[in-house]
Curated annotation (Swiss-Prot):
Name recorded for this polypeptide: Semaphorin-6C
Keywords in alphabetical order: Cell membrane, Developmental protein, Differentiation, Disulfide bond, Glycoprotein, Membrane, Neurogenesis, Signal, Transmembrane, Transmembrane helix
Signal peptide location: 1-23
Any one biological process term the GO annotation gives: axon guidance
SUPFAM superfamilies in alphabetical order: Plexin repeat, Sema domain
Biased composition (Pro residues): 940-952
Residue ranges annotated as Cytoplasmic topological domain: 657-960
Subcellular location: Cell membrane
Any one GO MF annotation of this record: semaphorin receptor binding
Role description: Shows growth cone collapsing activity on dorsal root ganglion (DRG) neurons in vitro. May be a stop signal for the DRG neurons in their target areas, and possibly also for other neurons. May also be involved in the maintenance and remodeling of neuronal connections.
Transmembrane parts of this sequence: 636-656
Amino acid sequence: MPRAPHSMPLLLLLLLSLPQAQTAFPQDPIPLLTSDLQGTSPSSWFRGLEDDAVAAELGLDFQRFLTLNRTLLVAARDHVFSFDLQAQEEGEGLVPNKFLTWRSQDMENCAVRGKLTDECYNYIRVLVPWDSQTLLACGTNSFSPVCRSYGITSLQQEGEELSGQARCPFDATQSTVAISAEGSLYSATAADFQASDAVVYRSLGPQPPLRSAKYDSKWLREPHFVYALEHGDHVYFFFREVSVEDARLGRVQFSRVARVCKRDMGGSPRALDRHWTSFLKLRLNCSVPGDSTFYFDVLQSLTGPVNLHGRSALFGVFTTQTNSIPGSAVCAFYLDDIERGFEGKFKEQRSLDGAWTPVSEDKVPSPRPGSCAGVGAAALFSSSQDLPDDVLLFIKAHPLLDPAVPPATHQPLLTLTSRALLTQVAVDGMAGPHRNTTVLFLGSNDGTVLKVLPPGGQSLGPEPIILEEIDAYSHARCSGKRSPRAARRIIGLELDTEGHRLFVAFPGCIVYLSLSRCARHGACQRSCLASLDPYCGWHRFRGCVNIRGPGGTDVDLTGNQESMEHGDCQDGATGSQSGPGDSAYVLLGPGPSPETPSSPSDAHPGPQSSTLGAHTQGVRRDLSPASASRSIPIPLLLACVAAAFALGASVSGLLVSCACRRANRRRSKDIETPGLPRPLSLRSLARLHGGGPEPPPPPKDGDAAQTPQLYTTFLPPPEGGSPPELACLPTPETTPELPVKHLRASGGPWEWNQNGNNASEGPGRPRGCSAAGGPAPRVLVRPPPPGCPGQEVEVTTLEELLRYLHGPQPPRKGSEPLASAPFTSRPPASEPGAALFVDSSPMPRDCVPPLRLDVPPDGKRAAPSGRPALSAPAPRLGVSGSRRLPFPTHRAPPGLLTRVPSGGPSRYSGGPGRHLLYLGRPDGHRGRSLKRVDVKSPLSPKPPLATPPQPAPHGSHFNF
């Protein structure tokens, strides 16, 4: 076996260096707590008015949240509901204190247009505070959008209706965002019934109305608007759209941020008249860095500015493409990074099928296109209408900038690839006792809410921590006529930090949750502090409490060591109490199940499960959240795997090499084993039974070279040797045998041996028949050389031969008589040629001619030293015409112990007076015992070349 390749160290080095060049993809964190809403009060849910038959059938049809002055406004189908958050804090259920009803008056015409009845209601899609006293609301109004003004406190209509075109979409499924800034309404939506004209529009103010370019894919291409923000001198719009710069990849969506100047007055009559002159857009890059960047391109939700590491940032939820591997990510973008991105280079497409490349600075006109007139680079121009035409034409053809806005931490704050897709985000940037902790609340499309600590904050590590996972969906209250998948999707999140609540909106209902569930820790201080919940703290007398609640300022945030070691951990739900020294593990559930003890030094629980009602149940694990979220470095893991593989391959290769060498050594020594019998000469058989002379001394080197082959075998030759030729003997199918007539045998003994493959036993007697009348293989024992007395004896088996060699044996009785009697009555053959050929009857199809065993005679030739090698080349056997053996003619050829066909002698049968040993072909060609044999001495038709042997006295031994 070849030795292990020398390239193994190189392969090991390659495997060790490969992980260094790759960045491991972040793993999904494991939630520390899993909860559901079992036992939650029914008053925490709101589905619509009790007397509303449509709401009872379809549900709420939630559209939008808006919080104003401790009042929560909920826009829905045909209604706007107002909830007093102060009353909710006092224990009242989720019941609106007032609401407005605005139904469509054009439902009949909507049905004529081919729309379904469920689509023809008035869905309130826009809800914007116009000032401190007025609320602007716009509805689809059966595909005829209309806007109205309402008083915030009274919810009574004020003024006349306005057209909602370009302010509100026609269809409830189309996206829209709107914001009021400096007395004007900035909206982004579809401006026509077919949603083919996407528009960013300004109206209802002292400034002239402006819009984006119509039907220009460079400006907007099938956008889905998500959020609008006023910041500084600009209004920002966040959306996703079908990419124009990567159109060769198909319909790939990119996340964008676009901005316009609030003081923009439009262009001149020659260019961009009544259109934006400051419209620019950038790509938002939310991706996992590495050799091949993995992008989360589809923006789903965005928050307002939140403090992150001392800087104002926006938090967004991004997902992968719809036809890609499902995955979600949370990325934060600093506002100053977004502003800096709008100072980047412009991008253009020089040819129709060409790539988008940055525009060189020498081709950009001055002042910089997109600048606000009167400030900055365009300070010399008091109005955008005074800008040069080349600037206006350039900004019309180059609204896209390069490069993309990077995330705040250069990578996502959280990535999820094995869970449901995230759809909504809400951020509390002032959590914790010192109001400096950021907590993310994330909604998904399967109805779960995640409470997450982002990395770098209180998580004390580079990995995020999922503090809690809550299943907030209730099929009984929120299903309606929608599909189960659509009904479970969370489409809105609203934080009430003062009331310590989170409002979760589904298409059919809304529900509110507490931001924390500190009471579940009971009287276990270790569990309370190890939960890492920024809303929970330990009170000396009240246990684990909410730090925002009554007495929340008098809490112990670090814990007393003596209290943690000797205090009791009590389950608040069941009242069971653990002994001293028990860990923070509390079995939250009914029943007297014992608690799981652990080391007192470990104060960090792991994943647990609980419910929000009286029936709580869960398990916590004995790991800190920080250490639990950290995994083994991927490079180290791959290096260990590669080293283990290389070590195992080396050891296994060494073992296999040793085993092969040992097998070759055994094969060369030809060890006799019961499972692998080999052909034996008669001399060997005689010696095994105590007969025959002692073996001659080992020959000299010169004589050993002349030693011929003693026998052949079916054993495979060693490497480098020629395979046995008996394995490929011709068959009757491949070598047809024709009847031979009037052939005459050669007079020489060696030619008689060459033609002996067609010899028969004699005239008038079927070949292959024994004395008993059945076919049996024959054994012909060659007489001893001249000068040695011998005796012709015929036996039926090798056993009889061995018994004869030991001495005189009594005659057989029964079914095994000696075969000497039939031979005495056999008439002698008149010609040698009559006994040299067999009939032309073919052999059986599945029969391979057996081997021939020749007994070497004693002579002056050197005896082989030891046993002959199994791989000695075998004599070539055939069924064709005669050939001379490659032996000298001046001496008799060496005897060979070879297997021959049972039907008669082979072409290498000896001449007259030469006795051969024929053995039947063993089953399977190897490894089987020899069959019954018959020892015969054929009558010599011609005098032999040497002196004929004389009969030996009975009982004497053969000399071989």
